[in-house]
Amino acid sequence: AASDVYKRQQSWYRTLCILLIIILVASIGAMLVQTNFGKVRTMNISIVTDHQQQLNATLYIPQNASAENKVPLVITSSGWEDAGESWSYVATELSRRGIAVANMEPYSHGTSGMFYQKGEMALYTNMYSDGMGMVALTDYLTSGILDFIDTDKVGVTGLSMGGICTWTTVQHYGHMYNAAIEQAQSPDSDGGESITEDELLAAQSLLKVTAALPCGSPPTANNGYDPSALHVNVGCLMGSIEECGDLVSTKTSRIVGDAIEGIEFINSSLSDGEKVDYVEEGTYYGNREDNTLRIIYQPLSIHGAIPIVPEAVRDIISFFTYCFEVNTPVSPTSLIYPAKLLFNAIALLALLAALLPLMDLVLAMPVFQKLRAEKEPPKVPALTDKKESKKFWIGVIAGGCVSVVTAFITMPLYLKIFPDASCGTPTAWFNIAPMNLIVT
């Protein structure tokens, strides 16, 4: 009847209004947390880099940042097929501790342009040369164009692909430093084969990054790691239960203890008398003041969850606040970003729920009325009859059990079919192990 249709539409209107209010309130809540209740300003920036590429980033600027009160800066990069927003939680925590953050959208991600290289290995070429835009963004942000940035305290970090970009960026300036020192030692330089103070200062001025923390990217040659180009404080963060653990000698994600990669990474900056044969997780080695600091973090986290796992976020906070000597009353354990996660989840669920009343109201519009069924179709028997309902739920549970059992059965099969990919080696199939598992 017409009255029933009218009542249903009114009910949908009320439901939709309630859901829209929930979305609005949750979004405002997330925004307040992200800006530390108005104490942090966020803004989007866009720059043009070499080869006429566009690179975008979101800046998180603490309220107290000014030309008279310069603040440290951390530049972040997401992983492959991820969004710059994934690092917003880390940015929220660092910025409320007085550190400006630039959440970069790497080339071919978000609204940034594509990398200019062509061919099958274009992604890897760019990661190992341009850092997917991180080098260009670092050059821009440390050029002095932003008067509130302390260019003597600039850090870089990123996850997975972003971790490789972090290695690339910090080592890019390290190689420039090495070249300057080599030039200063040439016989035709100002001081001859001896390095003058001015030559040393000129070389040190090329080190635009002063602290680096690659995440989910162990210090191996495959990730572009070159210890000879590291002249600043560097850490490495790997989840203790990462899926990419087969990339290291332990064949697990463990790079502390007696892991070769961890020992070599720590010893790379230590003198012969200081070298170690066992690495403690979360322990500082070397010296912050002379830029020989090294540390390895192994929080309980899988690979992709590192930027949102509390233990990992605390480690990231601890590293940069320590390297930059940030005096803040906010401890690394005081985290507010989970509230933003909650608000985001509420807004998302409300948005999904709003699709039902919205679609019903749209179908009531004259232009879409022909798409609406003349009468409501009968319910599925399984939802009306108890006996059929029992069969239905038994089928659902049985189907789930079959999925679990077959997953365990296909894992060994997957390792046999894709032996190279299972240990992180690129193949003619897919170069990421989970993709091959889907095939099997």
Question: Language-model features: where?
Answer:
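Generic preference for well-ordered secondary structure
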Residues: G29-M31, S78, T196, L300, ...
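Core alpha-helical transmembrane segments of integral membrane proteins
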Residues: S334-T440
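An N-terminal hydrophobic leader/cap segment in hydrolases
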Residues: R8-V48, N56
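Soluble extramembrane regions of membrane proteins in the secretory/endomembrane system
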Residues: T42-I336
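Context-gated lysine
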Residues: K7, N36-R41, K70, K118, ...
